[in-house]
Amino acid sequence: ALFLAAGFDDQLVLDDDVALLVIPHEVGSQGHIIVKTMINDHGPNRFALDTGASISVVFDKTPEEAGLELLAGEQVLVHGMIGSGHFPLTTVAELKVGKESWRSGRLASLPGNSWVPTEIEGILGVDFLSRYAVGVSAQDRVVRLYPPELVSNRSYSGWHSIPMRKLQIGRGTAFAYSINLHINKIAIPAILDLGAGFNLMNWRAARAIEVMPKGAMSRKIIYGAVEDARVVAELDVKNLGVENLHWSHRLFYISKFLIFEVLDLENKPAAIVGPAFFKDRDFVIDFVRNRLLIRAGT
């Protein structure tokens, strides 16, 4: 059976049998969730999962090594967490993650002028990830790709369901996804960004929750796919809530991040949460129902 009964007709246990793919992942030095891919039978290539990227990306030498050709005269505007730019497109005959195949995918080709490409060869963005419900297990160190229509039609025992909101990126058709954090009775939209190795916050959010940040203890740099940014302050949030879940001691870095402007959040309290926010909790992103499933603590 794909599911195990859990005592209620409408509540089922999400187990490995329903996953289309279970693949090991590693955590990069910047907190990225990295899996191995094959491009046109070339690889393995190290790609990071990134729900903050609307389009998948290949870096630097990967197109040349994989025999990819840039599409003449075609460019795409890529919005990163820190910067934006226009970059050429390439078409991949087949991109494989484990046994899951994506054919004729269009990827942006970015130069390797950031520190990020020294650790990864590319990014799997929402254009690939939204074809599935995506599960990440910190304890098992695996990524699970589930059939999206099956997961969206179920509720699961032992998982909390958190609503996600779709935020339009610029004037295009791409979207980012956010959840609401509650800190000191203030609701703060937080972009769910698997490509963010750290939790981030703008100054307006720090002021709204009336917690005094301290100057950055180090000259830490946040490395983005397009540009980099230096952390100017950091904030330890001792208590916060996400729906009916409560969390303690989450570190947020503060700087100027372009993505807040792109999402029309530059004049509002806003944050970004990456995989580090969940620590040892497993989670599943259900794009169809716009919800985040978080495994209950033990």
Give the ranges of each region predicted by the language model:
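Pepsin/retropepsin-fold aspartyl endopeptidases
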Residues: 1-298
